[in-house]
Regions:
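N-terminal membrane-anchoring/stem segments of glycan-assembly enzymes
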Residues: 1-41, 94
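Cell-envelope/extracellular polymer assembly enzymes that use nucleotide-activated donors
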Residues: 43-46, 76
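Acidic helix N-cap motif at the loop->helix transition within catalytic regions
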Residues: 59, 86-93, 144
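Short, acidic, metal-binding catalytic loop of nucleotide-sugar glycosyltransferases
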Residues: 63-74
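Conserved donor nucleotide-binding strand/loop of the catalytic core
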Residues: 74-75, 89-120, 124-127
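A conserved acidic beta->alpha catalytic loop
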Residues: 81-89, 104-106, 140
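Acidic donor-binding/catalytic loop of UDP-sugar-dependent glycosyltransferases
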Residues: 87, 135-152
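Single conserved hydrophobic/aromatic residue that forms the stacking wall/gate
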Residues: 162-173
Length: 173
């Protein structure tokens, strides 16, 4: 019986040691200082859109980007028509986007497409941008989306991620 008590005690000590550090995380929300949100800066942004056969919806996204309350002179829209067999590139050009086309049947997927697009943007726009937005071609944004995200970025947050669990046609924050 003493052996079982000893084994039980050793196991309890091991669990106690393994999980005690987690109690340090309990006061973290109360100790964290709020970041000051000063006035938003005028940042230059590039909007990256990788599209494959999205001619039906890409015009809506570009129109919602052109309708932003954020200054259009600080916003550049780039579309990569990736292995398209429809008129995605033409629709995006007519809507006012900077369009690149890629035809590569070996390196297929959004990762390759984004890499291709960012390499071309770096070469064609050596001054670069302060930040980047990546959207799917079927998104549509609320008119103040970029302005509100700029306020977050200007407040010191370098990365923002939005997960849409119940998708609607309008992205908003």
């Amino acid at each position: 019986m003493e052996t079982l008590k000893t084994i039980n005690f050793v196991i309890a000590v091991i669990f106690f040691v393994c999980y005690t550090y987690q109690f340090l995380y309990i006061p973290v929300p109360w100790l964290r200082k709020a970041r000051p949100h000063g006035p938003a800066k005028d940042n230059r942004y590039a909007v990256l859109i990788c599209a494959r056969n999205e001619q039906r919806v890409i015009g809506d996204l570009i129109a919602s980007l052109r309708g932003q309350t954020y200054s259009q002179s600080l916003l550049s829209i780039f579309v990569l028509a990736d292995n398209c067999t429809d008129d995605t590139a033409m629709v995006a050009r007519v809507a006012g986007a900077n369009v690149y086309e890629r035809f590569n049947q070996v390196q297929v997927g959004k990762g390759y497409a984004l890499d291709f697009l960012t390499q071309h943007i770096k070469a064609d726009y050596p001054d670069g941008f302060d930040g980047y937005f990546v959207f799917d071609a079927d998104n549509v944004l609320s008119p103040d989306y970029i302005e509100r995200m700029n306020a977050v970025f200007s407040g010191g947050y370098e990365l923002s991620l939005i997960h849409i669990s119940e998708p609607t046609r309008l992205l908003s924050i």
